[in-house]
Amino acid sequence: MAPSALLRPVSRLLAPARLPSGRASARSKFYVREPLNAKPDWLKVGFTLGTTVFLWVYLIKQHNEDILECKRRNGLE
């Protein structure tokens, strides 16, 4: 592959951004909305916190079982 072919995509990245011409540039494509954290979705918050608590409890329980198994195998108990 020729070096110029490799540099072509890089030169596009380094080139200054082109603004769209015509009427489209005068109107915003984005809508101004209320911030998402102004009105939280309590169902999602509950599921997220519940899942987090469940995973931590399961992790600690599994860790304790693994420690007991390790002690049993090594004859420490």
Swiss-Prot record:
Q: How is the protein disposed in the membrane?
A: Single-pass membrane protein
Q: Which domain of life is it from?
A: Eukaryota
Has UniProt tagged this entry with the keyword Electron transport? yes
Query: Which keywords, in A-to-Z order, does the entry hold?
Result: Electron transport, Membrane, Mitochondrion, Mitochondrion inner membrane, Respiratory chain, Transit peptide, Transmembrane, Transmembrane helix, Transport
Q: Where is the transit peptide?
A: 1-28
State the compartments where it is located.
Mitochondrion inner membrane
Q: Where are the transmembrane segments?
A: 42-60
A GO cellular component annotated for this chain's UniProt record is:
respiratory chain complex I
| Family, similarity comment | Belongs to the complex I NDUFC1 subunit family.
Q: What is this protein for, i.e. what is its function?
A: Accessory subunit of the mitochondrial membrane respiratory chain NADH dehydrogenase (Complex I), that is believed not to be involved in catalysis. Complex I functions in the transfer of electrons from NADH to the respiratory chain. The immediate electron acceptor for the enzyme is believed to be ubiquinone.
* Record note on quaternary structure: Complex I is composed of 45 different subunits.
Protein name according to UniProt: NADH dehydrogenase [ubiquinone] 1 subunit C1, mitochondrial
Write down the species.
Answer: Pongo abelii
